[in-house]
Structure formats: structure tokens, C-alpha cells
């Protein structure tokens, strides 16, 4: 009698589990985005900035060419980023796969806040795959009038992300590994470094060996256009539409 009861109970659990799997996928679909006007880098005129005054004559003297400087040293790569943030006067467009809440991540975010405070328009596009521990910070930063943050291909289940992996693997496996950094449409920095201690010789455990390239010239135009394509992609969601302010105790 006990065995039959156990079998019946197990069957009920299995049936309930199957029912859950059949009904939940409808809930995994990302919410429909609010209608948005596409944004493009050159909507902001950066032709009179200090960086433009330096770069424009070089481009006029070398039409169609690209100048570059390879950043092998991690501290030089960090200094280049911070210096570009400080020099930007109109816009900063940043795209990263990983941005951690560590010393490097915090240092760069504080620099971006200072830039936004002086009127620079900041667009930050982050892949959502590693954003779980940062989403509350992103949501708070997005309250700034000059900071816009989007998450690329976000998880529908914010707390239990494994559910997306089980129920929507094909979509969730499409990740954005791009790393680009653009100041006033004039200077771009691309490469393998994310914004995390391990990429800048700051981690106390291990370091990644990566390289960046700083660019001026025609290649920058391609990087600007690529950023715009990702920013306006259907998979790029404003953090305000995905992350709950109530969950992170924000108004």
C-alpha cells in the first residue's frame, strides 16, 4: 500500500513538472520594448571638441587612413581609458562583455559619472550574461540625465537565470563579446580587455594577458557605426525596462 502511494505521489510530481515545463516557456519571452527613436552617435555634434581639434587635421592630411597605438601594458590601457573619459566633452560610447563591481569597475564608473556631471552624454551597453551583480548599480546610474545604459540580450528570469538556460538556450546563447570605447566620435579603443581587475594587473589572484589598440581615422567611423547598430538592436534593452527598481530598493 505504501509503495503504491509513493508511486502515485511520484507520478503526480512528474505530471506537475511536465505541466510547468509546458506552460513556462510562454513566460520566457522578453517583454516588448517601449517604442524608441533610434539613436546615433552623430546625433551629437562633437566637431568642435578638443579631441576633434587634434584628430581632424590628422584625418585631413591622411584621408582614408587609420592611425593606431597598441596598448600592451595593462596599466597604460587603463590610463588611456581614464584619460579619454576626462578629455571627452560631448559623448562617450562604451560597449563591454564584462564590467565587474571591483576596483577597476568602480574607478571607471566614477570617472563616467564625473563626465556625465559636466554634460557628457554617456551610453553604456553591457552584455547581460555577467551583469547580475551589477544590475542594481546600472539601474541607479541610469537615473542620471546624461547616462543611458542598455543590457544586451537580457535574461528574462532575473533571479533564477538557469531557467533561461533551460527554456530558451538558443536565444540566451547569443552573447555580445564586443569591447569598444569611443570618445567624442574621434578616438576609439578596442581589444580584449573587459572592465575588471584581472585585465589591468590589479587582481590579487590571477591576471589575463590581453591587448588593446587605440585608433584614430577612418576605422573609428566603422567602430562608431558598429556601436550604433548594437545600441539600436532589438536585443538591446534599457536597463529600466528589465531590472526592477523595487527589488533594488530604488524609487
Feature-to-residue mapping (PLM):
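Short, low-complexity, disordered segments immediately C-terminal to signal peptides
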Residues: 33-41
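C-terminal motif of bacterial Sec signal peptides marking the signal peptidase cleavage site
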Residues: 23-26
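Bacterial N-terminal signal peptides that target proteins for export
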Residues: 2-14
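HKD-type phospholipase D/PLD-like phosphodiesterase module
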Residues: 48-50, 57-88, 98-251
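Short acidic, glycine-rich surface-loop motifs adjacent to enzyme active sites
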Residues: 94-96
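Bacterial signal peptide processing site
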Residues: 28-31
Amino acid at each position: 500500500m505504501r509503495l503504491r502511494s509513493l508511486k502515485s505521489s511520484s507520478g503526480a510530481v512528474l505530471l506537475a513538472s511536465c505541466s510547468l515545463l509546458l506552460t513556462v516557456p510562454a513566460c520566457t519571452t522578453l517583454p516588448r520594448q517601449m517604442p524608441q527613436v533610434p539613436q546615433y552617435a552623430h546625433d551629437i555634434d562633437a566637431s568642435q571638441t578638443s579631441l576633434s581639434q587634434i584628430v581632424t587635421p590628422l584625418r585631413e592630411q591622411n584621408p582614408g587612413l587609420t592611425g593606431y597605438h597598441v596598448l600592451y601594458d595593462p596599466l597604460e590601457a587603463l590610463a588611456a581609458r581614464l584619460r579619454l573619459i576626462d578629455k571627452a566633452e560631448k559623448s562617450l560610447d562604451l560597449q563591454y562583455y564584462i564590467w565587474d563591481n571591483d576596483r577597476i569597475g568602480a574607478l571607471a564608473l566614477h570617472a563616467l559619472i564625473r563626465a556625465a556631471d559636466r554634460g557628457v552624454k554617456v551610453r553604456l551597453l553591457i552584455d547581460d550574461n555577467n551583469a547580475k551583480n551589477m544590475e542594481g548599480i546600472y539601474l541607479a546610474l541610469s537615473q542620471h540625465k546624461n547616462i543611458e545604459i542598455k543590457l544586451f540580450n537580457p535574461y528574462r528570469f532575473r533571479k533564477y537565470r538557469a531557467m533561461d538556460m533551460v527554456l530558451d538556450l538558443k536565444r540566451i546563447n547569443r552573447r555580445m563579446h564586443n569591447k569598444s570605447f569611443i570618445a567624442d566620435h574621434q578616438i576609439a579603443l578596442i581589444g580584449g580587455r573587459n572592465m575588471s581587475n584581472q585585465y589591468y594587473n590589479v587582481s590579487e589572484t590571477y591576471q589575463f594577458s590581453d591587448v588593446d589598440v587605440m585608433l584614430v581615422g577612418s576605422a573609428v567611423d566603422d567602430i562608431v557605426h558598429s556601436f550604433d547598430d548594437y545600441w539600436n538592436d532589438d536585443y538591446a534593452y534599457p536597463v529600466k525596462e528589465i531590472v526592477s527598481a523595487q527589488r533594488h530598493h530604488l524609487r
